[in-house]
Amino acid sequence: MENQKENLFSEPHKRGLVKSPLQESSKANVVLAEIQPDLGPLTTPTKPKEVSQGEPWTPTANLKMLISAVSPEIRSRDQKRGLSDNRSGLPEARDCLHEPQAKTNEKSQPSRKEKSLGLLCHKFLARYPKYPNPAVNNDICLDEVAEELDVERRRIYDIVNVLESLHMVSRLAKNRYTWHGRHNLTKTLGTLKSVGEENKYAEQIMMIKRKEHEQEFDFIKSCGLEDHHVIKSTAGQNGHSDMCFVELPGVEFRAASANSRKDKSLRVMSQKFVMLFLVSTPQIVSLEIAAKILIGEDHVEDLDKSKFKTKIRRLYDIANVLSSLDLIKKVHVTEERGRKPAFKWTGPEISPNNSGSSPVMPLTASLEAEQSAKENCAKNLFSTRGKPSFTRHPSLIKLVKSIENDRRKISSAPSSPVKSSKAESSQNSPPVPNKMAQLAAICKMQLEEQSSEPRKRVKVNLTRSGHYKPLAPLDPAVNTELELLAPSLIQPLGMVPLIPSPLSSAVPVILPQAPSGPSYAIYLQPAQAQMLTPPHGLSPTVCPTQSSNATGSKDPTDAPTEKTATDATKPGSLQPAPERQGAKNRSKETTGDRGTKRTGALEDGGPGPIKKPKEDLKALENVPTPTTLFPSGYLIPLTQCPSLGPDPMLSNTENSGTLSPNHRIYGSPIAGVIPVASSELTAVNFPPFHVTPLKLMVSPTSMAAVPVGNSPALSSSHPAPTQNPSSAIVNFTLQHLGLISPGVQMSASPGPGAGTVPLSPRVEADNLSSRQGRATIHDSPVLGQSQLNGQPVAGTGAQQPVPVTPKGSQLVAESFFRTPGGPTKPTSSSFMDFDGANKTSFGTLFVPQRKLEVSTEDVH
């Protein structure tokens, strides 16, 4: 159909005369038959039927027949000879087909002898002179040589590698070498002999021969594990895997990639093979011994048969090239087990003393001097006069990799627990407490025992109180919102309260409960400001900070940086009950001895330093900032006061001593008030309640720690006089703050006690105003100070150049608050009156109702 379509397309004028397909196809065949004699190569011979009748004699003849049937060249050649000659007979036809193919195969494929490496090496060496002229270009192009010799280039590479091991050629670039000839051959052989002696190849050869004579086993069994260990011990460091390519100092490779090719197996094996001949006493080496030394018994055991045979073939290739160089000659060693192939050295004799080259002599001396692991490297085999060729052995690469892996493992390993514990201990150590944060830690540790919500709120307020912010003057219209704005309350520069309270209903409580013995000081923190208006119009001033007292700093500006609080981990922060009982017993002694006893108790109770009177006076004079003192509530045992920290917990003993040499009083080491700038006096009103003459049951030892509201500095000139709060309000507040237990009741109204005289703040203020004519402010944040033996003592303000001691004498009123669980002893009551002159508005105090119990102790 295709022919029909082609005919129709090629001859459109005959479309009307189209005949049947059979007639068209027969007509096309006739046309092809007419053209066939002209197309000789394309015709199919008529011989295949006759040839197929006979069977080929061999598989090779059959393959040739198939090739002749397919190949168009064979068909055309047969066609030229004539088709008639093919019909004469099958044998003649087969001979005609076999003879030309055999001739072409002989021309294309050389014989086995012609392909031998030895003959090829002879042809290669015949192209170049033995001693070339260095001034002439002696470059060799391997591609050109392979083409001229009609061999593969890899065969030329085998020859060149062996010649390069003897430094007869040197590599220039890819497929390009420089011919050196035999100029350096003697020098090279001398160097190789010295290296072979260093490697103790002669001893290895003798050992292997002795083992072979002793044992009558085959090749593998004759060198068992014993030989393996001996050979490994002698040649393990100098064996094939640990030896570098030996170079001459005068023949350096100029190509950049030369160093990467220096550890080729054929070149290194060739040098070691030559060493065996040079060091052996009868310079005859069999391939068996050479294989054991060069390849190694461990490699023989590890490698399979094919790989081992490949190594043996490489030795044969090296031997063929060396034979072409007339350095060795093949001989046969006759032994009991038969003949073995061996080679005898026929090259130049190299003596160990004069190895034919001057550089070898200093080399041996340097090798003897330096017995190190680098003696196997090529650069140690030559003098340093020439340019050193640095090579890196594969073993060094493995060593570097192992070191890098070890470093990676060490760096990625987690830190040891010892280091972490040390780090933790260093972090937990209190080198510089962070201001009020350590006091917060104390409260937190004590409050963990309490599960009630109010104490949790106390801890929250305690942590909030560590930030100091300036308090903007508040509008009287927003007095009810003061509690929300309380976190902005700040001390003036140089003022450090014990805990800057945010004026919330929750008060930080230190040691809310104690099982036994010690005296406690209770500090009330109402949410109101107690105004301090000194008489005669003198503006109240604030005492220097506790940090200034503790450190003896003269500059009040250094106080914020020097403020440190107590650390919960200090040993003296929590004293056992015996020490507390001791403090109680000491408090019952005479009044004259009480000062020194109290000083010893404070010094023994903790590490808080006692400041000097001169430093205190200087600190008093350096802080002129006027403030308003806010009473704040705390419950702190007096024996713990000096141990709570040097800054806010400093005792007032020495300060009091400076005020009155004759009367030593011991003020509170605890800050009981919160100072506020005097510019904010008129803008602060606190709704819950205010401090009025409040009677607290106290012990003698706790007298100095109670904030007394009847300070001479307090004036009754406030425009809004205060009211005395009822006992219920005080009890509510104390219970809500966790300062007292429900079973303890506290009186808030003034009343006489046995052997005590309540201090009248008004009378005291008027008395001091009339006598002194100046205001006195305490040098600690404690709102008031106690009086011992009827001697009232007032703190001095910054405006006073000299401290003033009141001349009036009154009985000492020591206040003490007994926590639940402490020892109680019903004795005559002593009271401390809080000032009730200043009147402020009351606010609603939402606190739970609890029962209060108050126990007293004898003052004397």
From Swiss-Prot:
DNA-binding residue intervals: 112-181, 261-347
Family annotation (SUPFAM superfamilies): Winged helix' DNA-binding domain (SSF46785)
Region annotation Disordered: where it falls in the sequence: 1-114, 407-433, 533-616
SMART domains the record matches: E2F_TDP
One GO biological process term: regulation of transcription by RNA polymerase II
Compositional bias ranges of the Low complexity kind: 411-426
Compositional bias annotation for Polar residues: 542-554
Positions bearing Phosphoserine: S71, S412, S416
Gene Ontology terms for molecular function: cis-regulatory region sequence-specific DNA binding; DNA binding; DNA-binding transcription factor activity; DNA-binding transcription factor activity, RNA polymerase II-specific; DNA-binding transcription repressor activity; DNA-binding transcription repressor activity, RNA polymerase II-specific; identical protein binding; RNA polymerase II cis-regulatory region sequence-specific DNA binding
Biased composition (Basic and acidic residues): 74-84, 92-114, 555-565, 586-596
Subunit field text: Homodimer and heterodimer: mainly forms homodimers and, to a lesser extent, heterodimers with E2F8. Dimerization is important for DNA-binding. Interacts with HIF1A.
Function of the protein: Atypical E2F transcription factor that participates in various processes such as angiogenesis and polyploidization of specialized cells. Mainly acts as a transcription repressor that binds DNA independently of DP proteins and specifically recognizes the E2 recognition site 5'-TTTC[CG]CGC-3'. Directly represses transcription of classical E2F transcription factors such as E2F1: component of a feedback loop in S phase by repressing the expression of E2F1, thereby preventing p53/TP53-dependent apoptosis.
UniProt protein name: Transcription factor E2F8
Organism in which the protein naturally occurs: Rattus norvegicus
Gene (UniProt): E2f8
